[in-house]
Amino acid sequence: MIQPQTHLNVADNSGARELMCIRIIGASNRRYAHIGDVIVAVIKEAVPNMPLERSEVVRAVIVRTCKELKRDNGMIIRYDDNAAVVIDQEGNPKGTRIFGAIARELRQLNFTKIVSLAPEVL
């Protein structure tokens, strides 16, 4: 469950290290975002000499949350951190590598490029 002011780790090599959610894309009054939702975020911490800089506003898709994700078959998945991948306007990742495991639900939400770059899909 990601809401505005939540800090997230960045799970790619785009140059950002930490994001802060400022808006959830979708319905105008959505309170929480879950895995697969697109958010608007500001970069709070960045790697020096990279294209993305601190205080830059970006779009990101959530790939891991500490809140449990319950699947239709009864399986419950919970991650150790909240993480997102920085994307462009078309939904393609800005980085070329993805770090850590991501959820299978991203494939159904047409984030196939992120799924193909991920080392592990749960």
Swiss-Prot record:
Gene Ontology BP annotations: translation
SMART domains per the UniProt record, alphabetical: Ribosomal_L14
The family this protein is said to belong to: Belongs to the universal ribosomal protein uL14 family.
Subunit structure: Part of the 50S ribosomal subunit.
PANTHER family listed in its UniProt record: 50S/60S RIBOSOMAL PROTEIN L14/L23 (PTHR11761), LARGE RIBOSOMAL SUBUNIT PROTEIN UL14M (PTHR11761:SF3)
InterPro entries: Ribosomal_uL14, Ribosomal_uL14_bac-type, Ribosomal_uL14_CS, Ribosomal_uL14_sf
PROSITE patterns registered for this protein in UniProt: RIBOSOMAL_L14 (PS00049)
Family annotation (SUPFAM superfamilies): Ribosomal protein L14
UniProt GO cellular component terms: chloroplast; cytosolic large ribosomal subunit
Name the UniProt record assigns to this protein: Large ribosomal subunit protein uL14c
Encoding gene (name): rpl14
Function recorded in the entry: Binds to 23S rRNA.
